[in-house]
């Protein structure tokens, strides 16, 4: 990926070397090679990073899920709106949906069902209660949505009003998708974006190295720690 720094490149190459039965190169060597060829990324010098006071990440899978949404602009002026659900331990994008309209309460409820079925199969109710963290968007705080969440075993939790950064893990996912996939892909219209979105999410889940996961992808982390 053209947006990967040397540590993520090293993680990818190490994964490939081990699959081929070869000794992986040292990360310092990767740094030197990338520097020699002008491939190192510039240090981020943007605005002040917003921080949250609470800890979003958890140590066990299926304890807390977070959800949020974002927009993707197209060259022709169309906009694609995406909503997603992440596990706050392994960072897997368990479910997502995209529309050219607004994200509705019905959409969020579909998102919940898709996440539950991805992790537990077709069940009427989760075997354990899982927190569902979101902001205070109308589609999330609607009475029907909160009631439905509890009916299937999710416990709705919302970030403090005017503090969306408290859902920092979801924000980090949005930044990753926009930086590593959206900005380097063709976006002539909504149809093209929506056609590419599943492959972006699949690559994120299967390949994208996370610093918090020891530079493993979500699926690598899941495989190493079991699927339960």
Language-model region placement:
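Charged DNA-binding/catalytic regions of mobile-element recombinases
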Residues: 1-228
